Amino acid sequence: MRRTILSSILVLLSTMAFAQSSSPESLYERGMDAITGIGPTRNDMQGIDYFRRSADLGFGPAQIALAYYYETGTAIAGSQSQALDLYRKAAQQGDPLAGWLAGRRYFLGNGVQRDPDAAQKWLKVAADQNNAYGAYYMGRLMADRDYTKAPKLYKIAADQGLPQAQYFYAKTLQDGRGIAQDRFAAYVWFSIAADAGYAVAGTGLGELESGGYLTTDQVSEAKAKARDMEQVVIRAVTARGCSGWDGEFDEFPTPPPPKLQRYCH
């Protein structure tokens, strides 16, 4: 009797262990281990296989990771339609990373016909969760659809350290478009963006300086305020975590690679 009970327990434990190892979360983590391995332990194709199995079980992060490979044609044949389908599936689950990546495709007309309504639908998933990239893209979209909403969206992303958003937020302040004109604040945000390496922000600084809109004392004060705010922004970037890939600071940010995506959900 005791032997029968012990055998039953062992079978149950074995079944539970197998189920756990085959869960979508576990498959996703095994995929991450495969693509982030060093030297001979790295195996992108094995990682993609794990992502595919997890994605087939409806796990959003795996769907996004697999979509990246389809979108970029990295390691597998590219398929823009499959990439978009996977992004949408994950966005339907409320994943903010998927929201901005799906919305980005419709906003840019990247692999799909440009569709501002669809872009707004998917970007909203991300922007409503204060996702920096979703808010930035939504700001760019709303600049043409309802410009009064753009500054607030830019500010969400600017506070989280996106120099593109800092630049466009400064532009709205400089021009008084959708927000009260404030050239002093514009100078501060142009300075922050320029210090982050967003070169075009230097043009905004030059326009404000050459136009005589600020006194010498105001310029000095704005520069000092920018330096103080940069420390706050740096802490926000650290807290955000989703950073560190080529294309991150392009005018239209590109998708983060799977090894960084785990920090972006």
Model-derived segments and their meaning:
Residues 24, 202-265:
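Terminal, low-structured helical/coil segments at or just beyond the last alpha-helical repeat
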Residues 27-36, 49, 65-72, 76, ...:
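Hydrophobic face of amphipathic alpha-helices that form TPR/SEL1-like repeat modules
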